[in-house]
A protein has these predicted regions:
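Post-signal peptide N-terminal segment of mature Sec-exported envelope proteins
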Residues: 26-59
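Short beta-strand edge/turn micro-motifs at domain boundaries
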Residues: 143-173, 260-281
Length: 281
């Protein structure tokens, strides 16, 4: 019992770092082209893109999509080199093209200190580090507007390239049922409590040993004390491989950028309702 309580208090300490993530702007606002990426500022007044551009890009930047997308979002020069212009914007029946001179820098989640993933299995998380990967999609999900913008990347001749943007209403997205659930889960405290299993498994660091993990259980009565601060309004997803609309499990990953934070929430679909059954920190 003492070890379980110690683990629970440790989770509070780990998750409390999430509380300052809420941005001052409305989450559905696009990042302005002139916005500064905090992690890249070295000298006041200098353009962070120019600072990054001065650093030589390793050939290894294309080996893992996980590495590439961060460089793509932070380096203006690299981004312009890795877009197939004119870039197709596919909105179903309507198709348009963006010319090179009209493109605005897309920073994705770099204005935050975290990004998110939605997967069916733990194995799909590891695909970001699969050197054999040849296609990936970054999804910009506007929960309030029920709208998804997809950025399609393909690795061509060893180089990752943005080849297309697709706009779709949320119901057309393979994750639509879960996204509708998540939107209510993070905005309605009563619904959130009703969406908890009677016992929520957790896995976290052992307070007595930095090299070990320990397991325990959180009951709904303790959830308010331990729940992480989850993003609302705008979230991102990186899709590697196939999405399965009929999957009865979804893992929502909240991963810090350069701060070591990682929280995984595992939901299971039971009798037509999503329930949180596990949290890993």
């Amino acid at each position: 019992m003492k070890k379980r309580l110690a683990a629970l208090f440790l989770i509070i300490a780990c998750l409390s770092g999430c509380s300052d993530r809420k941005a001052g702007r409305t989450m559905t606002e696009d990042v302005d082209d002139s916005e500064v990426v905090a992690d890249t500022v070295g000298v006041e007044g200098e353009d962070p893109d120019e600072l990054i551009a001065d650093e030589p890009m390793s050939v290894a930047v294309d080996e893992l999509f996980d590495d590439f997308i961060f460089n793509f979002a932070a380096n203006r020069k690299l981004q312009m080199e890795r877009i197939v212009f004119p870039l197709l914007v596919n909105s179903g029946e309507k198709k348009e093209y963006i010319e090179r001179q009209a493109w605005k820098m897309e920073r994705f989640f770099m204005h935050q200190d975290y990004y998110t993933l939605i997967v069916d299995t733990p194995e799909q998380i590891e695909l970001l580090k699969d050197t054999a990967l040849t296609a990936a999609t970054v999804e910009k999900i506007f929960l309030d507007d029920h709208f998804v913008r997809q950025y399609l990347f393909h690795r061509e001749k060893g180089r990752w390239m943005l080849t297309e943007i697709r706009n779709q209403t949320m119901p057309r997205n393979p994750n639509a049922p879960f996204l509708n659930f998540y939107e209510q889960f993070v905005s309605d405290s009563v619904f959130q409590r009703e969406s908890l299993c009677n016992e929520i498994e957790f896995v976290g660091p052992d307070p007595d040993d930095d090299f070990k993990q320990m397991e325990g259980v959180i009951t709904p009565d303790f959830w308010d004390a331990f729940r992480p601060d989850l993003p609302k309004g705008l979230i991102y997803n990186i899709v590697c491989g196939n999405q399965h609309p009929s999957a009865d499990q979804k893992i929502f990953v909240l991963r810090g950028i350069a701060n070591g934070l990682e929280v995984e929430l595992t939901f299971r679909l039971r009798n037509g309702r999503w329930k949180l059954r596990k949290m890993t920190t």
